[in-house]
Amino acid sequence: MKTFLFTVLCGMLLAGQAMAQAVNTLPQVLDSKVKSVQIAPSSNPYLPPIYVMGSDDVLNITFDYLDYDVHYLRYSVRHCNANWQPSVLVPSEYVSGFNEADITDYAQSNSTFVHYYNYNFTLPNADMQFYKSGNYLLTVYEQDNPETVLFQARLAVCENTVAVHVDATSRTDVDYNDRHQQVSFTVDYKQGLIADPYNELTAVVSQNSRLDNEVYLTRPFMVSPGQVTYDHNRSLIFPAGNEYRRIETVNLHSLNMGVERVQYFEPYYHATLRVDEARAASPYLYDKTQHGHFTIRNAESDYSATESDYLVTHFSLDCDRMTGGKIYVQGAFTQGLPAADCEMHYDQPSGTYTCDMLLKQGAYNYQYLWVPNGSSVGQTGPIEGDKYQTTNEYLVKVYDRPSGERYDRLIGYGINYGGK
């Protein structure tokens, strides 16, 4: 009884704190020495970071810390609701044991000019099992300085008790085979599983894992026995964008895709990319991409995790100077957001926008987003163009909070690769 009362009181305290001030749970790297953060299922590095309860397909978490000396690090997880604010659950309710553990799997870089340690761990693992589905905020920090967070990232745990069928089309409610794509989806469930679909469910829709333009829905279009339909909703109409641009820096001694030259200037390799052109006025051109993802790879080594070097990567965009906003490089390597260190700056002598980033050898997808002043949502139209034929990744996550429940359960998700 005492344990129950303590749990309830802790939950009420956390709820009060969350209501008093919103917590910043956006993915972000807070220490510039942390690089190449990746979270993905072990079966496919290009799938979203969602673990299905009871599955053997665990999530792999990997990152580098740039230093000559090893740093002893820990991680923790915190349960969040559908809107990514912390839930009222206490750790003992959502994970086994403690909600934090040491990162014990790490290795020093080998034969690289940039010295780093590569860290790896999986979730769930022997130290930590998930009791509850939903969103989880992952935090990594120094063992002896837990208040200083190195980075935080998002992952999810899914029950997979419903089937989510996602469709995307260029025949939208605002135009036909023009500049937009419209998403619709159904949620199929067993009778009795969802008592009040109109009030229990929250659906979250994202395009290419971007966070700046994801959509939250709290009311379905239609409910029928065993099925919920989300359709003809203006919020589900997305600018179509364009196929992601691609570069490769997998080989330091030969030509790479999208790279003009690779040179060494102490202490770094430098990769000067070919100058990009704005594509808004150009016809659509198909290219098979990974929808913004990246992979670490050194073509000259069997141990890419520790034998891939870092290069100062020079992006440049041939574009007239634009006012009233900013241009950003965006991809999974920018945490899916237009980030400050990925802002392009106009170079008057060359007449181009430029940005320099320290990136590990690999294959990268990226695009240029225009963010108007006063907005946090990136636009593809001004630079990349919005082409209805574009193949986009649309992820739909469905959460359920029955009456009287204290947290949002992630009951299912679905992915569509299309839009035509």
Regions found by a protein language model. Name each.
Residues 82-84, 128, 142-150, 210, ...:
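Short acidic/polar inter-strand loop motif in beta-rich domains
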Residues 20-53, 160-174, 289-302:
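Short, compositionally biased P/S/T/A/G/V-rich stretches that sit at domain boundaries
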